[in-house]
Amino acid sequence: MSLIPSFFSGRRSNVFDPFSLDVWDPLKDFPFSNSSPSASFPRENPAFVSTRVDWKETPEAHVFKADLPGLKKEEVKVEVEDDRVLQISGERSVEKEDKNDEWHRVERSSGKFLRRFRLPENAKMDKVKASMENGVLTVTVPKEEIKKAEVKSIEISG
C-alpha cells in the first residue's frame, strides 16, 4: 500500500516507478473489449466517471456532497430505493463538433456516473432533500431521533 496519494483517479501512480505513471499510453485509443462494469461508460475522462462523494454523519443527518462542475441540476438524478439505497447519477454529453472547428486539446470531462450508498437503519428515507449550488450537489438524509433511556432513581431502604 502506497502512502503517497493518488492524483490519477484510480490509475497506477507510484512516483518511484517511472513506468507506472500513465503519462503516455500508446494503446489507449484502441477499441479493446473491456469486461469491467464501467465498460458501458464513455472512456473520455475517468475523473468524471469515478465521481468522488463525501459522506459525513452529523448528530441530525447523513450529508453527502459531490463535486459536479459544469452540470445543471436537470442533468443529475438523486433516487432512494426501498432497500435503503441512495443513488446519485448523471451524464454530461460531449460537446458537439462543428466541421469548421479545429480542436487542439480536449480535457473537460464527459460521460456518465453512478454512485450508490447503503444507508443505515436510522435514516429517514421519506425526508431526503437534495440541492445543487455552484456545481456541488448536497444530499441530506435526516436521522431518526434516538430515544434517550429514561432513568428512574430507586430509593434504597434500610
From Swiss-Prot:
It holds the Pfam family HSP20. Residues 44-158 form the sHSP domain. Keywords: Cytoplasm, Stress response. Transmembrane segments: none annotated. Its main location: cytoplasm. GO terms for cellular component: cytoplasm; protein-containing complex. InterPro entries: A-crystallin/Hsp20_dom (IPR002068), HSP20-like_chaperone (IPR008978), Small_HSP (IPR031107). It is found in: Cytoplasm. Gene3D superfamilies: 2.60.40.790. One of its GO terms (molecular function) is identical protein binding. Signal peptide: none annotated. It comes from the Eukaryota. One of its GO terms (biological process) is protein stabilization. PANTHER family: HEAT-SHOCK PROTEIN 20 FAMILY MEMBER. Forms oligomeric structures. Belongs to the small heat shock protein (HSP20) family. This is 18.1 kDa class I heat shock protein. It comes from Pisum sativum. The lineage of its organism: Eukaryota, Viridiplantae, Streptophyta, Embryophyta, Tracheophyta.
